[in-house]
Structures are given as structure tokens and as C-alpha cells.
């Protein structure tokens, strides 16, 4: 393995566990296992009757999961995207779900995965290298308009058209097969500026999101997670850029708050909340950033599924006990969600 599980530093570790409020006999799902940092924390709080389901579409992550937890009867391992978690668990059976979005540190750190503009490697970018087109294959056949649309939509890259034209012109001379080729090409056509950010940052992000269908998977995964949670179950989502966080924030708000039109106009069926917001946006503190600078852009949001139609939390005594056991005095999460978090 490129990086040992022990060396992996999960972001917002304490905040995630506080947000999930793990109970000894609960059932939990980690939809983005990665190197298992958060999963280990969940397992530490599970008793013999608890259950943890882990998912990842990266075969290297699945290999780590099997090596680390293959002998633990409480753990079930599934290779695939969290967008399909509804095929892994039945409806209303899970006490907590974690989605840690985006590319993992091991994927970025290994040049051979093709995610990093700072390390030369094959231009791949697939989280599942056995599925779909690689970045090189897509860039070899996409039109300049298609490329520009992706760079703008998923990277908010202002120079998207200029970069797209440069890619199409260069591939007519030689194929773009390496990350360094693409990064250098993008840098060569970008206006000079004082930004400390590498000029290829937004383009690499955009291409990666497109290749892996990340935002479509996120929308499907959030819907599936809501269906899989029990009343009182909690959904914790870590995002790393504004596009992801916007989707998560809007999803949680859609099921937690009546839209403005419902407050002004009579409705045949009044709005009934399905989720309760447990927290606003939670970010890493200075101490964590000192140890793990990659946590700087991480944003955690947590919501709790409500009981059917009563507008109240479905948390039972087991979850209340967990609240007194696991959260610390300075935890950003209340023991139960009886009002919208600030």
C-alpha cells in the first residue's frame, strides 16, 4: 500500500464521531472508507452487537479494509459508490451514515493514480480505475466546448475557453497522457498573477469531478442516505469545495425547512420536516490545521432524521446515552436536535 492506515490522518475526526453519536449496538455506514480513519473511530465505540458497513469504489481502499477489518464479524465491506448504498442496506435500518467527499490523501499522494498536478504520472484520475474513461481518454475526444463547459461548471475556471482551445490544439500535435503535460500546458496559457494557487488547480478539480461523476453521485447518495436512516439516525457529510458544500447544505435545508413560498401561500398539504439540522458548517480548528493542513477546506454538516410526521426527534434512550458518553464539553453538537443549529 502506498500509505499505511496508521499514517492516515482523518479530517474532523472528533467532530464526526460527536456528530454521529455512536451507540454500542447501532448500525453505521461509512460510504467513503478511504484508509479507514473514521471507521476505526466508529468501531471503537461499537459493542459486539454493533455493525459497521464500509463502502468505497477504490480497489486500494477496499484492500485496506479487508486487511484491517476482514476478521471483524461486525464489519461488512462493499466495493462501490455510496450512490448505490440503497442496494447495500434496507430502508430505515441505519443509525448513522458518513460521507467524506472528494479525493483522498493517498489518491493525491500516489503519482500513478493521476490526480495530482504536482507529481507526474499517467493522466487517469479515476477513483475506480476499472470503470469508465480516464482523463486522458476523455481529453483526447472531447470538443473544446465540452472541455470548457466542464472546466467552468466544476472548477469555476474563468479561463476555461482559453485552456480548452489549448488542449485541443496540443492534442493535434501529440497526445496528452501525463499529468505534468497537462499541468504545464495550462500554466503556459494562464495569465500571470500573484496567486499562490497552482494555475492548474481548478482545471484538475473540474476534470476529476467530471470523470468520476462526483456531484451526480453525491446527489444520489444523499437521497439514498435519507432513505436508509432510521428516525433519530444521523447523516454526517464532509465536503472540500463550494460545489459539494452547496449541494449538501441545500439538500439538508430542503428537508429541514419549509420553502419561503410555503410560509406565504396556503398549501393543501403543510410542510413536514424530515431532517433536523444538528449543526451549521463545522471547520477544523488551528490545532488540527497545524497537524493536517489539508483539512483547511473541509466543511462538516450533520443532520438528524426525524420521526414520521411528528416534527420531533426520533432519538431513543440509546442515543441519549451515547450523547452523554461520547461528546465532550466543548462539542459543537447538542445531545439532541430540538432546534435548528446556528
UniProtKB/Swiss-Prot annotation:
Chief place where the protein resides: cytoplasm
Function noted in UniProt: Specifically methylates the N4 position of cytidine in position 1402 (C1402) of 16S rRNA.
For whether the record's keyword set contains Methyltransferase, the answer is yes
**GO term, biological process aspect, one:** rRNA base methylation
Q: Care to name a GO molecular-function term for this sequence? A: rRNA (cytosine-N4-)-methyltransferase activity
Query: According to the UniProt entry, what is the EC number of this protein?
Result: 2.1.1.199
- In which residues is S-adenosyl-L-methionine bound? 36-38, 56, 82, 100, 107
The molecule here is called Ribosomal RNA small subunit methyltransferase H
Q: What is the lineage of its organism?
A: Bacteria, Pseudomonadati, Pseudomonadota, Gammaproteobacteria, Lysobacterales
Q: Which organism is it from?
A: Xanthomonas axonopodis pv. citri (strain 306)
List the PANTHER family: 12S RRNA N4-METHYLCYTIDINE METHYLTRANSFERASE, S-ADENOSYL-METHYLTRANSFERASE MRAW
Q: What class of enzyme is it?
A: transferase
Per UniProt, subcellular location reads as: Cytoplasm
Q: Which Gene3D superfamilies match?
A: Putative methyltransferase TM0872, insert domain (1.10.150.170), Vaccinia Virus protein VP39 (3.40.50.150)
What InterPro entries does its record include? RsmH, SAM-dep_MeTrfase_MraW_recog, SAM-dependent_MTases_sf
Catalytic reactions on record: cytidine(1402) in 16S rRNA + S-adenosyl-L-methionine = N(4)-methylcytidine(1402) in 16S rRNA + S-adenosyl-L-homocysteine + H(+)
Question: Region labeled Disordered — which residues?
Answer: 311-342
Amino acid at each position: 500500500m502506498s500509505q499505511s492506515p496508521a499514517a492516515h490522518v482523518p479530517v474532523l475526526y472528533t467532530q464526526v464521531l460527536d456528530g454521529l453519536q455512536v451507540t454500542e449496538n447501532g448500525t453505521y455506514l461509512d460510504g467513503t472508507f478511504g484508509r479507514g480513519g473514521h471507521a476505526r473511530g466508529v468501531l471503537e465505540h461499537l459493542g459486539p452487537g454493533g455493525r459497521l458497513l464500509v463502502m468505497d469504489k477504490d480497489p486500494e481502499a477496499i484492500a485496506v479494509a479487508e486487511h484491517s477489518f476482514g476478521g471483524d464479524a461486525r464489519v461488512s465491506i462493499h466495493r462501490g459508490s455510496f450512490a448505490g448504498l440503497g442496494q447495500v442496506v434496507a430502508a430505515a435500518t441505519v443509525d448513522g451514515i458518513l460521507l467524506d467527499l472528494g479525493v483522498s490523501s493517498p489518491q493525491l499522494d500516489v503519482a500513478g493514480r493521476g490526480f495530482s498536478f504536482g507529481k507526474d504520472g499517467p493522466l487517469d484520475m479515476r477513483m475506480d480505475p476499472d470503470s469508465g474513461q480516464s482523463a486522458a481518454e476523455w481529453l483526447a475526444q472531447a470538443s473544446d466546448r465540452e472541455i470548457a463547459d466542464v472546466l467552468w461548471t466544476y472548477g469555476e475556471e474563468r479561463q476555461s475557453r482559453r485552456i480548452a482551445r489549448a488542449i485541443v490544439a496540443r492534442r493535434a500535435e501529440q497526445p496528452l497522457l501525463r499529468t505534468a503535460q497537462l499541468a504545464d500546458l495550462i500554466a503556459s496559457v494562464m495569465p500571470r498573477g500573484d496567486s499562490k494557487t497552482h494555475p492548474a488547480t481548478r482545471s484538475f478539480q473540474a476534470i476529476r469531478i467530471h470523470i468520476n461523476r462526483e456531484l451526480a453521485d453525491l446527489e444520489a447518495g444523499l437521497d439514498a442516505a435519507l432513505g436508509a436512516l432510521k428516525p433519530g439516525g444521523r447523516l454526517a457529510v464532509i465536503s472540500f469545495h463550494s460545489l459539494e458544500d452547496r449541494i449538501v447544505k441545500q439538500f439538508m435545508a430542503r428537508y429541514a425547512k419549509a420553502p419561503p413560498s410555503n410560509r406565504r401561500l396556503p398549501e393543501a398539504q403543510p410542510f413536514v420536516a424530515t431532517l433536523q439540522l444538528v449543526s451549521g458548517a463545522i471547520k477544523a480548528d488551528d490545532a488540527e490545521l497545524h497537524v493536517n493542513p489539508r483539512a483547511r477546506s473541509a466543511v462538516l454538516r450533520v443532520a438528524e432524521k426525524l420521526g414520521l410526521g411528528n416534527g420531533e426527534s426520533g432519538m431513543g434512550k440509546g442515543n441519549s446515552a451515547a450523547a452523554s458518553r461520547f461528546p465532550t464539553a466543548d462539542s459543537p453538537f447538542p445531545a439532541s436536535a430540538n432546534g435548528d443549529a446556528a
